[in-house]
Amino acid sequence: MNDDIMRKPPARRLGQQAFVLRHSPDGQDELHVLLVDPVYRDGYTLPGGSAEADELPHLAARRHLETETGLALPLRTILTVDYMARHQYPEGINFVYAGGVVTPRQAKAVNLHRPPPNIRALHWIPRHLLDTVMPSNQALRVHDAWDAWEHGAGRPLLLRGTPVPVR
């Protein structure tokens, strides 16, 4: 499905991504963000993809997160919005949703999850390494989402003026 969207994308992509953290498995208090290594581009990115026609944006983010990582998390808080002018891909707007900090059990399940063929691998990356594993625009997006998450600056997605329910 993602390959079709990349070959015949809509006029303006509406990207939906999830920002999910875990605590360092070595017992330190350092947080790591969940990233995917897609086959269709260089560098890692947040889990996510385009919303289908008439698909609610937060549910598109959840669908991509679950398909790519096995996690089914409620996603309703937007941490950042990133406009991308047409370049290698069509013009798009990317919404990043807060997935929160997963439990050790959830993190282990992600590590055991077999991603779909369009994802090479899943990685938990500490913040200080983001710039080494992601294209600069992607790393800037994740840094901005991380800052918003740390400061509680997210905003709920509204559907006709009403915050979406947590599901």
Task: Label the model's feature ranges.
Residues 23-31, 88-90:
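Short, solvent-exposed loop/turn segments that connect beta-strands within catalytic domains
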Residues 51-74, 82-138:
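Unchanged
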Residues 1-17, 23-25:
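Acidic, metal-coordinating catalytic segment for phosphate/diphosphate chemistry
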Residues 46-48:
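Thr-Gly-centered strand-to-loop micro-motif
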